[in-house]
Amino acid sequence: MNRDDLYRCRDIEMGIKSAMVVYEIKFAQVTKTTQHLSDMPKSIGKIHYDLEDLIDYYRDKIVKKQKEAEELIKAIESQFELMKDERYVSILRYYYIGSLSIKEVASKMGYEEKYTNTLKTKAIEDFEKHHTKSN
């Protein structure tokens, strides 16, 4: 595991959050459309199934991304166990796995934003040192 894996993890987590928003919007649209169509006579069956397929498609995309994230997080967490400074682990976990902004991480940890950025840089370096030692 190296910094690229941390970046990839953050990208996946942000993608999941974004996909969840799209899913919720689509689900609301499908629910509203289905309710509207249920008042109509014929041929709503096919439309209803098409709408269900659309919802299933978005749900499957999210589940696939979540599985990918889980595998990556498991590997990252095992490398975190090798790190001695809990501040570093917390910053990396909040930022890359929790998808928090630096401002949110700083607030959560009670640090200034600039100091949090400095610690994040050091934390990434420490994370990569353990990659070298463990492989």
Residue ranges: model-predicted function:
Residues 72, 86-88, 119:
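N-terminal positioning helix adjacent to the helix-turn-helix/winged-helix DNA-binding module
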Residues 82-83, 110:
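Short, conserved sequence motifs enriched in acidic/basic residues, glycine, and aromatics
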Residues 83-100:
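Short amphipathic alpha helix immediately N-terminal
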Residues 91, 119, 133-135:
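N-terminal functional module detector in eukaryotic proteins
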Residues 104-109:
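Short alpha-helical "recognition helix" segments of helix-turn-helix
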